[in-house]
């Protein structure tokens, strides 16, 4: 390669690396600001936010978690931030709630069909909590389809936990499952099923269960006013901690 071409190629590589570093820095700031905004608005979740470390990653097209890290796609982050940053907050909280309710380590998942239903059940459970969470940082008014489905399900189950939803979904026809997936499936669950995550199942689950119990105690003793606008979260914590 001639010297002049080597120089041009070197400049090109340098500029690309600089762009990547700038993009990474912007994405890290977006995640940091999202976490801080929600931690201030929902102080009872501060310890949980501290337990899940955000990282910008090319391993996902959206967002996902393995219970230790929160993986976020840089492309998705930038595009979503431009459209509506509340969606980033919701997805961040979506991942946190999966961890608190230990959806990642459920032992019901033995076959691929179970995995599909469990993924959907877990997403419905956390979306329902967020739709009942009247916090400006994460609130987007649920559409009529969601409201009607919640009404129907709550006629059968008092609290829409993932366990409860799993059994309700087993009664659904395929076309209804597809429609529900279009409405409620949001994040990337493939991190749940990696050999590394399954091997550390017991210890990770125990850590989040302990955090969940402490959170319920804190809300009941100190933060009733702070959690007053989130009956769905309180009900979920009580149901999961029984």
Per-segment meaning from a language model:
Residues 1-89, 96-242:
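Short, functionally important secondary-structure microenvironments
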């Amino acid at each position: 390669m001639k010297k002049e071409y080597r120089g041009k190629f070197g400049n090109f590589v340098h500029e690309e690396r600089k762009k990547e570093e700038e993009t990474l820095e912007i994405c890290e700031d977006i995640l940091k600001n999202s976490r801080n905004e929600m931690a201030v608005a929902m102080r009872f979740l501060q310890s949980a936010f501290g337990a899940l470390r955000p990282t910008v990653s090319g391993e996902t097209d959206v967002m996902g978690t393995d219970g230790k890290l929160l993986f976020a796609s840089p492309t998705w982050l930038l595009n979503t931030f431009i459209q509506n940053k509340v969606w980033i907050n919701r997805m961040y909280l979506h991942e946190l709630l999966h961890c608190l309710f230990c959806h990642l380590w459920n032992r019901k998942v033995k076959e691929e069909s179970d995995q599909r239903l469990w993924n959907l059940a877990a997403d419905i459970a956390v979306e329902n909590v967020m739709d009942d969470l009247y916090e400006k940082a994460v609130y987007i008014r649920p559409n009529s389809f969601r409201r009607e489905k919640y009404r129907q399900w709550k006629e059968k189950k008092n609290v829409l936990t993932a366990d409860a939803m799993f059994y309700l979904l087993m009664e659904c026809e395929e076309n209804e499952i597809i429609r529900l997936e279009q409405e409620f499936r949001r994040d990337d669950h493939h991190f749940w099923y990696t050999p590394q995550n399954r091997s550390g199942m017991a210890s990770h689950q125990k850590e989040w269960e302990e955090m969940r119990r402490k959170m319920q105690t804190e809300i009941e003793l100190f933060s009733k006013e702070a959690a007053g606008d989130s009956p769905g979260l309180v009900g979920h914590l009580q149901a999961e901690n029984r």
